[in-house]
Design a protein with these regions (language model features):
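An amphipathic, aromatic/His-enriched active-site/gating alpha helix that lines ligand/cofactor pockets
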Residues: 20-38, 57-95
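Short, well-ordered beta-strand segments in beta-rich or mixed alpha/beta enzyme
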Residues: 2-9, 38-72, 107
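Glycine-centered flexibility motif
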Residues: 13, 34, 45-47, 88-89
Length: 108
């Protein structure tokens, strides 16, 4: 299992636009083969208010490549991308493919 980790640098004054984008992406991502672990918005309690995150699971790297192609072609995703770009809510994004470290079974 692999996880796509997305870090967004956002305009904190446009958090509502980013939240609307995140909510609108659930269906296109799921329909394209991704399993959303979550979209995470910043809070004023701790950490930067200009950073938001998303995590999306895929089984294999081959599945990830299929997911990316399907998502890029998804009409709702394309419209979501156009809207968020026009809003200026996202300044930049960073993506990484990460893998969860699990504890070893007892006795190994």
């Amino acid at each position: 299992m692999y996880t796509l980790f997305l870090l967004y640098t956002i305009d904190p004054n446009k958090l509502a636009d980013w939240r609307a984008y995140a909510q609108a992406e659930f269906d296109p991502i799921t329909e394209s083969g991704g399993r959303i672990t979550g979209y995470y918005a910043p809070t004023e309690f701790a950490g930067a208010t200009s950073e938001a995150f998303a995590t999306i699971d895929v089984g294999t790297m081959a599945e990830y490549e299929v997911y990316r192609a399907k998502l890029a072609a998804h009409p709702v995703h394309q419209e979501n991308a156009r809207k968020i770009e026009a809003s200026g809510a996202i300044h930049s994004s960073y993506r990484a493919i990460i893998q969860k470290v699990e504890p070893e079974a007892a006795g190994k």
